[in-house]
Design a protein with these regions (language model features):
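Short Pro-Gly-centered flexible turn/kink motifs
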Residues: 30-33, 46, 211-230
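Polysaccharide-binding surfaces and accessory modules of carbohydrate-active proteins
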Residues: 1-191, 207
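Active-site neighborhood of glycoside hydrolase catalytic domains
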Residues: 316-325, 329-333, 355-523, 527, ...
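Short acidic, Pro/Gly- and aromatic-enriched capping/linker segments at domain boundaries
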Residues: 194-214, 453
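Carbohydrate-binding surface patches
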Residues: 160-162, 170, 576-617
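Active-site beta-loop-alpha junctions enriched in small/polar residues
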Residues: 105, 183, 226, 260-265, ...
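Aromatic-lined carbohydrate-binding/catalytic grooves of carbohydrate-active enzymes
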Residues: 251-393, 402, 406-407, 418-419
Length: 618
């Protein structure tokens, strides 16, 4: 190869670092563009390679340009030696006289020599998120993708592991793991070609998202993070967990509070008396924070059900005559921190906001609007700077008026239907999927800059936003709306492959579960919740005195193991997906002087001995 060609150096591959559609067109590509003169090809050559230390890692930048057109692509690699993770992304720009259309713009290309390669990936609908699927890779292409538009981790997840030497194992084997740090639509293509190579492409899903790139405009792709371990899938997980806590997750090294959320306890039936009672009961159990969920807002249209009021973020005085200040004062008196629920990206057609600004919702000309939850919910157009200002103002006004708010649960309960924007110009309607999430990120950056100590949870119909694109601004995610203890073992097992316990909200709910109707012992519900960021999701008034006493002891026990669970190294021992009737995992402190060991019995067998469980990490 010529020195200037964009080829990998020092490996057995003769693949470009960033494959382009152009002179050679027969393979999958990372980038495809059409110049304004109609030429659909690119031919990139290297102009320079630079290195610098930046924000805890070393960044290598490979600057390339087209041989003929003033079209430039810079490929970045950022290495983190303290966790053995590499981030990669690209910047695309041009100095042509007229716009260039981008049809493909991957964040990453990763070629892997084919052997006995196995893919581990995670799928599942609402209430059954992140179920593990494993398969041997055969000829052809495997595509993992999402097109929800708002939430991107219900149905599938932008993460995978590739075991290079046979069937996947937790503690043995050579494994590559990858995850896309993006909150919008994504596409991960794993292509087994006839040259005995597995070629991996990861980035934004380009379907209905061709991008008109103006001269001098810079298009930056999301980060794709990847790692390698010869200690099996568990080694990959521990690398990602360290990377998250040290470099990616907001307040990643800080201890999380034990909280009670009001949703499953009282739904939208909030009022001052009930909130005071729940706080008093939880404080007596040793709790640390109370979070008031949906149902507290709406003036003209009080929020009594899911059909109205989103966008009208003012206190419903009928329910809370003392306002939020009455609740924060009550929490303070009881020694609790206070949090609140919002869904600021959404509105209802039955709301004062929609009556005032119908142009702010995502919509199409000459089409009837398809509405979501309650038959009235609509998505606000975050590509519009006025809407971004409004959404930022929701949080800013709450925090300015009530600085004692310590926690915000940020929800998003609708798919992006009615694809169209009254803000974007006619020739850039295809930007909406991307512009929506860039608008969301702009809002979150402003909130983070002004309120750096504020703790926020990413919720989206449960576990719809479990991704590293948002976690620099959120401290945790709601893992699933399904709080059934048995099913949570499976869900949390899947999520733990890429995300640390400190970010994984796991709540104790009632004995007849809200979603499944299953009855489970209180001890099991606490034991499962203790393996993540533990909280509660019930009405304490419905607990017996015996259950309250047990909860006090369990909360005290969790406080003892919280440092090792939230900041320790995870070792998954017996998988619930192996169908042995058991699941087991443990957390080990970095100094290896403390450990928390969990064993769950999933099925009841008569007169069957329990298998031996081998610990790890000590």
């Amino acid at each position: 190869a010529n020195p200037g060609d964009v080829f990998d150096s020092g490996s057995a591959f003769n693949d470009p670092v960033y494959p382009q559609f152009g002179v050679q067109c027969s393979r999958e590509t990372a980038i495809q563009a059409t110049h304004n003169d109609g030429n659909m090809s690119l031919e990139l050559v290297v102009e320079s390679v630079t290195r610098e230390n930046r924000d805890g890692g070393q960044v290598t930048a490979i600057a390339t340009r087209d041989k003929f057109y003033p079209f430039y692509v810079t490929i970045y690699y950022k290495t983190y030696p303290d966790c053995e993770v590499i981030e990669t992304w690209t910047e695309i720009r041009h100095l042509e006289k007229k716009p260039v259309t981008l049809y493909r713009f991957a964040s990453a290309f990763l070629p892997v020599r084919r052997g006995d390669n196995w893919l581990s990936h995670f799928h599942g609908p609402w209430g059954a998120e992140a179920y593990l699927y494993e398969e041997a890779l055969r000829d052809g292409m495997r595509v993992i993708k999402d097109k929800d538009g708002v939430r991107n981790t219900q149905n599938s997840c932008p993460s995978f592991m590739l075991t290079l030497d046979g069937r996947p194992d937790e503690q043995h084997g050579m494994v590559i793991g990858g995850t896309l740090a993006w909150s919008g639509n994504y596409r991960i293509a794993i292509d087994n070609d006839n040259a005995h190579t597995t070629r991996i492409f990861a980035g934004i899903n380009e379907d209905q998202s061709q991008y008109i790139l103006e001269p001098k405009e810079v298009f930056t792709t999301p980060v794709f993070a990847f790692t390698f371990s010869d200690e099996g899938k568990g080694g990959v997980s521990r690398n990602f967990h360290r990377w998250a806590r040290l470099h990616r997750l907001n307040h990643g090294g800080e201890q999380r509070s034990i909280l009670l959320n009001s949703w499953e306890g009282v739904s939208m039936n909030v009022n001052q008396e009930v909130m005071d009672q729940m706080m008093a009961d939880f404080a007596a159990m040793g709790g640390e924070m109370f979070v008031m969920d949906d149902g507290w807002f709406g003036d003209k249209y009080p929020r009594n059900n899911g059909t109205s009021s989103l966008g009208d973020w003012v206190v419903c005085k009928e329910k809370l005559p003392e306002g939020i200040e009455g609740l924060t004062a009550s929490a303070r008196e009881k020694g609790l921190k206070f949090g609140i629920w919002i869904e600021p990206e959404m509105t209802n057609s039955k709301s004062e906001l929609f009556e005032k600004h119908p142009e702010w919702v995502i919509q199409q000309p000459h089409r009837e609007m398809h509405k979501g939850r309650g038959g009235t919910q609509l998505v606000l157009d975050l590509s519009n700077p006025e809407v971004q200002e409004f959404v930022f103002g929701v949080v800013d006004k709450l925090m300015t008026a009530h600085p004692e708010i310590a926690y915000i649960k940020w929800d998003a309960n609708m798919t992006l239907f009615n694809y169209g924007s009254t803000y974007l110009p006619r020739d850039k309607q295809s930007h909406l999927y991307i512009a929506y999430h860039r608008g969301l990120e702009n809002i979150l950056k402003r909130i983070h800059a002004k309120y750096p100590g504020l703790v926020m949870q990413a919720c989206a119909s449960g576990g719809g936003r479990i991704n590293y694109g948002l976690l620099p601004y959120y401290d945790e995610f709601w893992t699933s709306d399904n709080t059934d203890a048995l099913q949570r073992i499976f869900i949390q097992w899947g999520v733990s492959n890429f995300f640390p316990a400190v970010a994984m909200a796991s709540h104790v709910s009632v004995d007849t579960n809200y979603q499944t109707g299953r009855k489970t012992p209180l001890k099991l519900r606490f034991d499962v919740a203790m393996s993540g960021r533990m909280g509660m999701e019930l009405q304490p008034a419905h607990m017996t005195d015996e259950d309250k006493a047990f909860a006090r002891r369990a909360i005290a026990d969790y406080k003892l193991i919280r440092p090792v669970v939230q900041q320790g190294d995870l070792y998954r021992l017996i998988s619930p997906f192996d169908k042995t009737g058991y699941a087991s995992l443990m957390y080990v402190s970095p100094e290896k002087d403390h450990a928390a060991y969990f064993v769950y019995k999933l099925e009841q067998y008569h007169n069957m001995p329990r298998p031996a469980f081998r610990m790890a990490g000590l």
